[in-house]
Every structure is written in C-alpha cells, then in structure tokens.
C-alpha cells in the first residue's frame, strides 16, 4: 500500500507540474499578444500614413470629381478642432442666413478674447486649392479652401494674420477689395492636420474675434439638397450649398459636446440650420 501511495503521489505531482506548465505557456502567449496589440494601437498616425503625392480631385463643369480611386475613408471623418474651442463663446450654425445672405458655412465667436489670442490650425490633412484676400470694415481678411483626397473640403475665412509660408502665397494675389471671391492655387499646397493657418482672426479695430468654418463632402449631396425648394433657392451655389455638412458631429466627442452646448453666435438666425438637426 505504501508503494501504491507513493506512486499515486508522484503521479499527482507530475500532473500538477504539467498543468502549471500548460497554464504558464498559455499566459505567456496571451501577454505576448497583448503587447503586440498595444504596440499596434499606439503607433502614431504619422508613422502609418504618408502624405499623398498629388491631389486626385479636380473641379469640372459638374463639380468636384476624383481623377482616380479615392482612398478608403470613414463615412464621417473625425477632424481636429481648428482652434481652442474652450475659448469660444458662440457657434455660428452652417446652413442659415446671416447678414442678409445664405451661409453654408458656420464658425466660432470668441467675445472674451482679443483677435491675436486665437490661433487657427488645419483640422484635416489636405491641399490648399483656392484662396483669397478681401476687405471687411477696411481690414484685410483671408480665406483658404483645403481639399482632402477623401473628397472632403473645408473653408476657413476671416483669417487676419497668416504665418510666413501662407503670407508669401497671399502676397501674389491681386490687391484686396470688398470682393471675397477666391482664386485657384497652381500648384496646390499641401498642409498637415495641426499646421498653423492663422495667428489672429476677425476684425482687430473693433476687437471682433471670430472666424468662419465650412465643411463640404463631395462624395455625395447633402440631405437638404434633396428638397426641390432648396434646389431652387440655391441653384447658383451647388458647389457649396449642396455639399455642406453640419460639422458638429465631425469633431472629437468632447469637442462636439462643447460645440453643441454653445449659444448660437447669430442673434437673428439662432440655431436655425438646414444641416444641423
């Protein structure tokens, strides 16, 4: 019986050792996989994305069209906020009438800040395809249209002071007048998300700190443009009005919530919008 007991004990010990070994091996594999996953998830976007060599979107008679297959892009890309919106005191809703004219773009107001307190940065990689300078209340203002190869364009306006690289471009344009129309850039200029586009905004004489921001999706027409009445009202501005979006939900969640909590920046149109519901 003693021999049998000793044999049983040895067998049990061997089984326990084997089980521990198997558990240890499985744990090692699991931890290794977790490390690989963590390393993959934490890879900076700049290391996996390379700037496109050229713009694949061109404007023709029927609007913006891609000249080759666009990259795979989410239906609703998340963009960086173009400014520190913790300073914003109001939001201008896209798709409303302001100052007697229809505005497919929105924007931000910064009533508690000076003009030079607001820095505007690129919310998305893209190519500057158009730009313009014009006079508002006697002060020079700048506008840029920037197109991403996904087919998303954004417009930033009422920029007051530009960084040197963009000022060199603006210096080649005709002298500014009250006409705010833009002109094409040739060649186009690539900018990365986060690049500085302006170091002051709005009208400095009256310390009116604000800027315009519109986002346009050329992969499809917006819901508002499906209305016959809307089509008739905006037949002359299909490029912008038929493709403008409510960019509130195109921001990181915290910024999106902040924007939606802001009071409307236009006292007349308020929160009325053809795009934001």
Residue map of PLM features:
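Hydrophobic alpha-helical membrane-insertion segments, chiefly the h-region
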Residues: 19-30
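Ser/Thr/Pro/Gly-rich low-complexity linker/stalk segments immediately outside membranes or between
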Residues: 32-50
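Surface-exposed, glycine-biased beta-strand/turn segments
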Residues: 44-143, 147-150, 190-193, 243-245, ...
């Amino acid at each position: 019986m003693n021999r049998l007991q000793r044999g049983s004990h040895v067998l049990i010990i061997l089984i326990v050792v084997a089980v521990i070994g198997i558990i240890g091996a499985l744990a090692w594999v699991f931890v290794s996989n977790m490390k690989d996953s963590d390393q993959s998830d934490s890879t900076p976007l700049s290391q996996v994305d390379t700037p496109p060599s050229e713009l694949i979107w061109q404007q023709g008679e029927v609007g913006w069209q891609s000249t080759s297959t666009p990259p795979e892009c989410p239906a609703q890309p998340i963009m960086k906020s173009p400014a520190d919106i913790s300073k914003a005191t109001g939001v201008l809703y896209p798709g409303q009438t302001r100052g007697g004219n229809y505005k497919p773009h929105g924007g931000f107001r910064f009533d508690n800040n000076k003009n030079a307190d607001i820095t505007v940065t690129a919310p998305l990689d893209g190519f500057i395809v158009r730009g313009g300078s014009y006079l508002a209340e006697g002060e020079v203002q700048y506008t840029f249209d920037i197109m991403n190869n996904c087919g998303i364009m954004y417009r930033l306006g009422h920029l007051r002071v530009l960084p040197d690289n963009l000022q060199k471009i603006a210096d080649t344009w005709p002298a500014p007048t009250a006409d705010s129309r833009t002109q094409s850039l040739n060649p186009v200029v690539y900018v990365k998300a986060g690049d500085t586009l302006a170091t002051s905004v709005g009208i400095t004489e009256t310390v009116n700190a604000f800027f315009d921001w519109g986002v346009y999706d050329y992969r499809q027409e917006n819901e508002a443009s499906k209305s016959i009445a809307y089509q008739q009202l905006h037949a002359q501005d299909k490029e912008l009005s038929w493709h403008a979006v409510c960019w509130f939900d195109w921001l990181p969640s915290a910024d999106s919530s902040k924007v939606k909590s802001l009071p409307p920046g236009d006292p007349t149109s308020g929160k009325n919008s053809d795009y934001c519901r």
